[in-house]
Amino acid sequence: VQYYNTGDKDSTNLIAYASDLSMFAMLFTDMQNGTRDYGNDRPIKSVEVAILSTIEQNPGITVSDLSQKQHRTKGTISSIVSNLEKGGYIYREKRPGNAKVVHLYTTPDGERLNTLYIAFVTKKTAEIQSELLKVCSISEMNSFCKVLHEYVKLLSKAFDEES
């Protein structure tokens, strides 16, 4: 099946593309919202541990900055941050001279969970890549990644314009 516009008047290809893209988005969203134990015997949502990972990579990040980086509303980020704090994975800190702005940091438990998460994602990505290489060439996979990267940029721009 060709998923790009070949110039003919038949829109079937574009409908197939839109259908697959919608299904991919739904399945990926379900996966992100699912709860999983990454190896610390404390199940957590994938989206929460992804936010935790961003906090560890950006010590002192604020909810506003996290919201922009993750293209999510401040309310959504605040809710996730509260869950991470309740779980003992992060802590909040105000800096002297600016009691309004709260900075976020990972705890040792948060750092351990992030290490487990990165190991899980690395293993899962390798497994998926191995399966895809059975039916796709490396060139096709690279093309998909390029298109996906550009698609993310378009969606991010649209999100930023709506915010």
Residue ranges and their predicted role:
Residues 1-13, 138-163:
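C-terminal regulatory/oligomerization modules of transcriptional regulators
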Residues 83-142:
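Charged, amphipathic alpha-helical coiled-coil/dimerization segments
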Residues 24, 28-35, 70, 110-132, ...:
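Alpha-helical linker/hinge and terminal dimerization helices associated
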Residues 1-43, 112:
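N-terminal leader segment of winged-helix/HTH proteins
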Residues 32-73:
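N-terminal helix-turn-helix DNA-binding core of bacterial DNA-binding proteins
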Residues 18-25, 48, 52, 107, ...:
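Generic structural concept
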